[in-house]
Amino acid sequence: HYQEIYDSDVPVEKLYEYVIKSNKDIFLDIANHYWSVEKKGHYDMAVNISFIMFLYNEKLTAAKLISNISDDIKKDCRLSKEQMMDYNAALTYINAFLDYNDFTKMNAQFIKVADITNKPLKHIAGHFPFSFECPSVMSIYHSSPGALDYETYALEECASNYYRITNGHGKGFEALMKAEVLYNRGEIESAEILCHKALYMADGRNQYSIYIAATFIMTLISIYKGANDEFKEHMNNMTHITENTSYLPQHMHKMTDICKSYIYSNLSSPDNMCEWLKDYKQLELSINFHSLGFANIILGKYLILIGDYHKFLGISGQFLGLNHIYSYVISNIYTYIYLSIANNETGEKEKSHKFIMMAVNLAMPDRLYMPFVHNYPYINMLLDEINTAKDISLFVKNIQRLSKPYEKGVKAINKAGRLLADYGLTVREADVAKLAAKRLTNKEIADQLFIAESTVKSNMKMIFNKLEINSRAELKNFFD
C-alpha cells in the first residue's frame, strides 16, 4: 500500500487540492511510512510529501524528511548526477519554506537553489499558488509591526532570483505587495498603477493567483472611488477567469469566493457572501492552513454584520491563536477591531477601548489605515473616545480623512446595485439609464454602448416603467 504510494508520480498540483484539515492524518501517516518503503531511485512522492508537511505546518516532520531524503539520495547509485541535482534543488527550495514568512531567510535558501542548478526547478515550484489561495500577499508576508517597508523591500530584492529558479512562479508578487501596502495607506492612485503592473506581469506567465489578487485590490479601489462601472468590470473579470480558463484548479475557485465574500462584507452585504465562508468548521476544513488567517477576517466581519457578537467572542481565541503561529499582523489588526466592536455591543466598554488600542498599536507604525476605514461606521465613536493621546491623534485623523470618500463610495456602489436588484433593471438598462441621467441623447448613448438607437428607445421605455417615472430629468434622483 505505502510502497505503491511512494512509487507513484502524482504531481504536487494534483495533491494540493486535498491538502485540507480533514486529510491531515492521512498525509501524516504517509509521511511516517517513508522509512519503511524501498526507494529504488524514485523520490518524487517523498519530495512532494515533505512539502505537504510544510503546508500542514508540520515543520519538524518536514525537516526530518528533507534531511533523510537528502542522505538517501547521496547513497542511491541508481540516480544520475542530474537527477541528484534536481532532487537536491527541490529539497533546498522546500527547506526555504521552513522559514515562512521571513522572506529574507527564505531568499538565502533560494540563492542556494541557484547555486545547485542553473535551470528552473523541476519539482514543487510553480505547482502551487504563490499565496496559497489567499488574495492578500501582504496579509501572509507582513509579520512584524513597524517592519512593513523592509518586508516589502525584501520581497522586491528576491523577486528576480525567485523567478529565475521557478520559471516565473508568482510573477508580479512584488508589485502586488507594494500595491496592497499603498492601498492600505490610502495612496489610492499609486496603488492602482502598481495593480496594473502586477496584472501585466502575471498575465504574461499565466499566474492566475496573482492576476486574481491584483483584480481583487482594484475592486477595493473601485469601491473607494465609487466607480460602479469599474467595480462591475473587476467583479466580472474574476468570474471570467474561473469560468473560462481550461483546467483551472479548484483552489482558484476558492480564491475567487474569498475575494468576492471579502468585498461583499465591506459593502455590508452578508447575503451575497459564500456560504462556506460563514461557518467556522466548514471554513477550517475547506481551506489551506496558510490562508485561514485571511479567511477568518471575512468570517469575523460576517458575524459582526449579522450581530452575532457572542459567537465571534467565542471563536476569537482560535483566530488569535492561528495568527500567533505565523505572526499575521493584518489578521490580528482586524481581529482586534472586531473584538472592540463585539465588546462595545455587549456593554464591555473598557475591553472595547483596550482592543481598539491594540489594533491601533499594531497598525500605526506602518500607517495601515484601511482596516479601520473598512469598519469605520462601527468604530468611529470608539476612535473618538480613545483619541485623547497625542501620539495617536494623527493616525486617527488619517482614518477619518479616508473614511469620508470610502463611505461615499460604498453608498454609490450599493445604490447602483439596488437599481438592478430593487427595481429589476437589467445591466444593459442600468447602463442606458446612467448615461441618460447625464443628459446624453439616444444617439450618443447608442454610440457609447455600441448598440442600435432603437434598442436605446426600447430600453428607455422599460426604465421609465420600472422606475415609475415620466421624464429623463427624474433619473437624477436615482443617479448621482
List where the protein language model places each region:
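Linker/hinge segments immediately adjacent to helix-turn-helix/homeobox DNA-binding domains
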Residues: I298-L305, H310-N332, Y338-V427, K443
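Recognition helix of helix-turn-helix DNA-binding domains
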Residues: A421, K438-E474
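Internal alpha-solenoid helical repeat scaffolds
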Residues: N32-A214
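Short coil/turn connectors between adjacent alpha-helices in alpha-solenoid helical repeat scaffolds
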Residues: K14-D25, M53-K64, A96-I111, M138-Y153, ...
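Alpha-solenoid helical repeat architecture
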Residues: Y2-I5, G41-A46, L79-A89, P120-V137, ...
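Alpha-helical repeat scaffolds
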Residues: I26-Y34, T61-D72, T104-N118, L148-Y162, ...
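Extended alpha-helical scaffolding segments used for macromolecular assembly and cargo binding
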Residues: H1-I52
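Structural register within alpha-helical repeat arrays
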Residues: V10, K14, I49, N95, ...
